[in-house]
Amino acid sequence: MKPLVDEKHSSVIGHENIQEIVSHLKKGHNVVFLANHQIEADPQAISILLDPTYPGLAERMIFVAGERVITDPLAVPFSMGRNLLCIYSKRYIDNPPENKAAKQLHNKKTMELMSQLLKKGGRAIYVAPSGGRDRQNAEGVVEVAPFDPQSIEMFYLMAKKAETPTFFYPMALSTYDLLPPPETIQVEIGEVRQTQRGSIHLAVGDAINMENFPGSEITNKQERRKARAGYIHSRVCKDYQNLIV
């Protein structure tokens, strides 16, 4: 992975926020990164970007990932040496239908483990609420995929239930050019992968207030969750635009 990265022209934005995060973790608090996701090697990309200034931070991060990172032979190497909690995403949980119940049980057990980790504290967790990688639109522009309100709500509720101080931060990643995903989402394993060398970028924004945000006054729970997801998504999109200019 590292030989593909043009480190000289890569960048990290938001050092003051990352320093704040390191301080939270030292105190035994939890940090949850709500991030976009562009390539299967994002965990390695994060390490390459953070290790020089924040040694150990990326290494201790727990990545909530789709099951393909451990079932697709070509994806497995990208996740080796990472702390993973694997779940079945909504788009794959029904395929094949006869395995749906087993997949749901697996997801339930994974979320129970996540709750235990949050309760212990001192955890840094990466979550991509989109449930998948960013892709190009019809004009060939890479767009940050929409965030799932229910996914964000689930992690927020687990954090509150843990009763350990937990802080949420937006993270924007620009890694797409290194290993672009296929234009369409494939159900079957075996997508084509083409790599190229280039720069990568990461931004960590200010902590997110999960209770006070544009639309937090909405009384309908579902609509309020949508407003929060939209707000967090807009924060990540704004930081992402700053990375690619």
Where are these regions (language model features)?
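Membrane-anchoring hydrophobic helices of lipid-metabolizing enzymes
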Residues: 1-31, 37-50, 58-59, 69, ...
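Short helix-capping segments at alpha-helix termini
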Residues: 53-57, 163
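Glycine-rich, phosphate-binding/catalytic loops in enzymes
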Residues: 48-52, 143-145
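Non-catalytic C-terminal accessory region of glycerolipid acyltransferases
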Residues: 100-245
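Short, flexible loop/turn elements at secondary-structure junctions
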Residues: 35-39, 65-70, 172-177, 206-208
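Active-site cradle of extracellular carbohydrate-active enzymes
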Residues: 65-109, 113-115
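Short, well-ordered, mixed-charge alpha-helical segments that flank or form enzyme active sites
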Residues: 41-43, 70-74, 95-96, 134-137, ...
